[in-house]
């Protein structure tokens, strides 16, 4: 009986994960990425910042993926690196900011400074109205679902 309950829980979790992937794929298919691709192609310098360990791991994946097309991202880690870099950025640069909630205080503060400097920014956050997405030039939303 207990094993059957665990199996049902596992099956539901697997179904939720699969549904989440399907939603992500559908959202990406429906999103016009031409503007983002153009900025990645034309930017003088490219940067990526993630608010936590998982988000930083995503910035590392972005960095590796774009090496194949000779576009090199600098991944920023921590407050000092982020804030020092912002002071040197201009309209010719691009920054990708990754945050689950889009409400991380440091990311929001950085996005405000980047916007004031005219830097093109792309946020990647969960599908919700959030401060980071409102501050960035373009937003990509990732459907997320919490499971117990």
Where are each of the predicted segments found?
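HTH-adjacent hinge/linker in prokaryotic transcriptional regulators
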Residues: 1-31
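Short, flexible segments with low predicted structural confidence
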Residues: 10-12, 37, 85-86
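Alpha-helical scaffold segments in soluble metabolic enzymes
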Residues: 20, 35, 109, 113
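Glycine-rich phosphate/diphosphate-binding loops that line cofactor/substrate pockets in enzymes
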Residues: 31-44
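Glycine-rich phosphate-binding loops that contact phosphosugars or nucleotide phosphates
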Residues: 41-148
């Amino acid at each position: 009986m207990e094993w059957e309950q665990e199996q049902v829980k596992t099956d539901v979790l697997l179904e939720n994960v699969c549904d989440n992937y399907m939603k992500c794929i559908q959202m990406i298919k429906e999103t016009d990425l031409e503007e983002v691709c153009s900025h990645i192609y034309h930017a003088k310098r490219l940067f990526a910042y993630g608010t936590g360990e998982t988000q930083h791991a995503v910035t590392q994946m972005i960095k590796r993926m774009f090496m194949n097309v000779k576009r090199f991202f600098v991944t920023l880690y921590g407050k000092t690196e982020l804030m020092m870099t912002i002071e040197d950025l201009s309209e010719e640069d691009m920054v990708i900011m990754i945050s689950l909630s889009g409400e991380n205080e440091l990311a929001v503060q950085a996005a405000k400074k980047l916007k004031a400097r005219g830097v093109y920014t792309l946020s990647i956050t969960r599908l919700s109205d959030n401060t980071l997405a409102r501050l960035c030039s373009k937003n990509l939303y990732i459907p997320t679902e919490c499971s117990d």
